[in-house]
A protein has these predicted regions:
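Terminal alpha-helical anchor/extension segments at protein ends
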Residues: 1-197
Length: 197
């Protein structure tokens, strides 16, 4: 029986590898009996070496799609909280030591206007009125004259939305945490940079 189970688990691992080769996954989550799930995780780690593998112990054994969806959603939310907290701390630390990060609305706008934003982090999305150059599109808070081309700045209703759009258009990443974070001390916004500004 033990050999049969082991062969079955190897087949499961091989199937997962085939799926991984067909698609670009960043994480494999394994549910089921926790003892077998750990064995499957070890087998998969031998086959798929460059992808994260985790066991969803709370899932248990189920064939109910809603139970799987709930467990995966819960895992994703917990992971997002951990990752976003880590990103916020890294940005604040890098900013405070004068590295490749900015914090605060003015700093982020300045970096965005120079196409330097790599990852934009917003703790809680709230529309903020601002300015945009009518000539070159540069963003601002209260400037009368464009900081880049010295053109006329016009009023805009949602500066944060334009920062998000501009970051994505410039091949950056955007993370909206959806709650208060240590970035609140810096207008609730920060960014890691591609280059120093």
């Amino acid at each position: 029986v033990e050999n049969h189970v082991k062969n079955h688990l190897k087949n499961v691992a091989a199937t997962l590898r085939a799926l991984y080769e067909d698609e670009d996954y960043s994480l494999i989550l394994i549910g089921g009996n926790s003892n077998y799930a750990l064995v499957v995780a070890d087998l998969i780690k031998e086959i798929v070496t460059n992808i994260s593998i985790d066991v969803l112990a709370e899932l248990g054994i189920t064939d109910q799609p809603h139970a799987v969806a709930e467990a995966v959603t819960s895992y994703a939310l917990k992971s997002f909280v951990v990752e976003s907290s880590k990103m916020v701390e890294e940005i604040i630390t890098e900013y405070e030591k004068g590295g490749l990060a900015v914090a605060g609305l003015r700093g982020v706008i300045y970096a965005s206007n120079l196409y330097a934003v790599h990852q934009l982090i917003i703790d809680e999305y709230e529309p903020i009125a601002g300015k945009q150059c009518q000539s070159c599109g540069a963003l601002g808070i209260d400037e009368v004259e464009c900081p880049l081309c010295h053109g006329e700045m016009g009023e805009i209703e949602d500066l944060i939305d334009l920062l998000i759009c501009k970051t994505l258009r410039d091949d950056g990443d955007v993370f909206v945490i959806g709650g208060q974070s240590p970035l609140r001390e810096y207008d609730g916004i920060g960014a890691s940079l591609r280059f120093a500004v």
